[in-house]
Structures are given as structure tokens and as C-alpha cells.
Amino acid sequence: MKVLIVGSGGREHAIAWKISQNPKVEKIFAAPGNAYNKVIKNCENINLKTSDDILNFALNEKIDLTIVGSEELLVDGIVDKFQKNNLTIFGPNKEAAMLEGSKAFAKDFMQKYGVKTAKYQSFTDKEKAIKYLDEMSYPVVIKASGLAAGKGVVIAQNRKEAEDTLNDMMTNKVFAAAGDTVVIEEFLDGVEISVLSITDSEVIIPFISAKDHKKISEKETGLNTGGMGVIAPNPYYTKTIEEKFIQNILNPTLKGIKEEKMNFAGIIFFGLMIANGEVYLLEYNMRMGDPETQAVLPLMKSDFLDVINSALNKDLKNIKIDWENKSACCVVMAAGGYPVKYEKGNFISGLEKFDINNSDNKVFFAGVKEENDKFYTNGGRVLNVVSIQDNLEKAIEVAYKNVKEISFKDNYCRKDIGTLYVPIKD
């Protein structure tokens, strides 16, 4: 079986690693991939980035399954193109991908189907948006509606900050066309939870929960990033919270998918907020999270390829996904200066100490390139250092111990991944 994985980050490395465990997989192609092809057997990078080029490659190579990691191509309609050519692909079609591609569309969907979410209004007219600010209490959340690499959300502390943010997004175009439409919504103060799930449009099966750490600095301060680390499962995802999530968010989401005839097999990532004991949906992502995937997949006991095939065959109702009774901690090692300005091309030492097939400790490649059997930095988020242990405290301890074994110029990581959260009883 030949599998094509679309994307270039640590998420795609984790997917490739998990898929490669299935004996049916003879060859993995990564488009465009990164240096992880050097540590996964029978894996080859192909330097293709557009949906048309990737489609032509899949046709010529007779690819059996394509898995799309990156959101941009999903919103661009890569799944629809593959399906028109009778190619098997895992991911949402263009319509369903709009649940991530347009926050305004997603919020309207939530409202229509009774998904519990924060109060909001969407705007394409800046003056009307500014006027609406007078009705809000602060802080307030302002979101660029389109894709902004996880960085298009601003929490404005006061009226002036909110108006400045609207000017940045709608006039100065700091997020380009993504900010043509903005969503202004009430601020919810609480704990965030990430729940990845898989759907065949008939059922949705949640994965174990996770906790991302979005800000660049300790104690969730500083600039937004794509994510600086993850723990899984999330200590705050209690049985009570899970029941509220299923009743008020998952079930109405599935109802909407069915009624809107969004017929697809893929991932739904629920970005949740617990506030005052209630669970709210902040956003949908229609693909695996990064870096959530790097912490969640190592805890999956079931064969991931078999799970994906069950979704493609609309047979999820007949399977159960098994999970390790363990905890994971993923620490992101970034280039100094990320997420603003940073160097590339710095030599990475210490990677030889880690085996991707080690069940307890892994290093997934994100912004990494290989030259002459040596590895160099090639992005802002460079490495994902993951440890799987019997409890969260041990997973955090070992992950940071492993971080110290790796070095590159001006490397940076948050020192508090997982430590802000302590287990609580239901």
C-alpha cells in the first residue's frame, strides 16, 4: 500500500510514524515533508505544494491513500479534486473545511445547530464593527475569520486595543485576506481543552483530550504561536465535562454535518473552553492539531491506519479506539526569535540519542532539514520532544530531561509545559 501524507510539520511526522507501523504500508510519500524521511523507513519526500501538482503525482504513482495535514489545501478543495479523480483521500471536502476556513461560517453553523459557544457578531464593515465595540464588555475577543496559522485571535483588554486590532486586521491587513471579515465575541475566562476526533459523517469518535500551550512565554503570556507544547490527556477533561461536551457540542455538530450533507471522512478538532463549569466551543479545526497530534498519537494503542480506513468505509460505528493508560508531554523546541524573526540553517546536535521507535521517548521533526546526514533548523518551531510515562508529572520531567540532550543555536522552549495544570477530581 502506498500512502501520501500532505504537509511539512511535526504533525505530519507523527502521522507518518504511526501509519508506518501498519505492515500493509510499503511506501510513504511526503509532500513536501521535512527531514523525517531520514528516520522513517521507506519514506520519500516529494517537493510538491499545490493541490494540482499533488493530484497529478497521486494519479501517476497510483497512491492508495492520501492524508492531508495542512489546513490551507483542505480549504482550497484538494479533497474534492481527488474524489473527482476516484482517488481515496482522508479529510474534509471544501464545504466542510469551511468550518475551519471561515470563523464566521463556523459560528453561524454553531448557532444554527445549537452548539454551545460564546456570543458573537461577524463584520465585513469596519465602521460597524467599531460601533459594535460600544456594546461589549472587556476584555473582548477579536478573530480574523480566515486562516491565519493559528495566530489570528486577539484578546483586547479595552476599547482602544479592540479598535486598534480592527484597524490592524481590516485596514492594515496584518493577516491579509483572512482579516477581511472579523468575528467579535465575548471573552470566556477558563481552561482550554483540545479534543481531536474522527468522523465518517455518521458518527464522531473523540480521541483522548489534550492541552495546548499557545503563548510564546511562560504562564501563557506574550505573542500567539502555533503551539509551544501539549499534555495529554488533559487533567481538566473530567467525566462531567466529557458528558457536557458530547451533549452540547459533539452531538449538535454531528446533527449539523448530517443536515448540511457534509459527507466526508476526516478529523474534527474541537477547541473547547471550560468556563464556570460549562463547556463552550471556541473553534473547529478540520485536521489534526499541531502539536496536539504529536502527544495524542503515541498514546493510541489501536492501529491508526485501520481507524482511518474504518472512517473511509463508513464503519466507525463498529470500532473502538483503544488508548494507553499513560500520559504524554510534548515540548516544542523553537528557534530564538520565533514567532517573529528567527534564523534558519543552524546545526542540531543530540538527535542521534533518540529512536523514533522508542515507545517512551520520541523526537518529531518540524522545521528541520537534512544535508549530508546532518540535521539543521529550517523553521520557527523546530522539534517536538515527546515523553510517554505512567503519569503526567513523570512525562513532564522526562520530556524536559530529553530537551537538555538536544542543542542548536539560540534554541528556546517554554519551561512550564503542563506545570500550570494539576489533576482535579470530578
Give short role names for the model-derived ranges:
Residues 21, 38-39, 90, 112-114, ...:
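Solvent-exposed alpha-helices and their adjacent loops that cap or buttress functional pockets
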Residues 153-293:
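Internal nucleotide-binding/catalytic subdomain
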Residues 1-95:
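ATP-binding N-terminal substructure of ATP-dependent carboxylate-amine bond-forming enzymes
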Residues 44-50, 121-125, 156:
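Short acidic-hydrophobic, aromatic-tinged amphipathic segments that line or gate anion-handling sites
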Residues 246-268, 285-358, 370-371:
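Active-site "cap" helix and flanking loop/linker of ATP-utilizing ligase/carboxylase catalytic domains
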Residues 368-372, 376-426:
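Generic C-terminus detector
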Residues 92-151:
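A conserved helix-loop-beta module that forms one wall/lid of the active-site cleft
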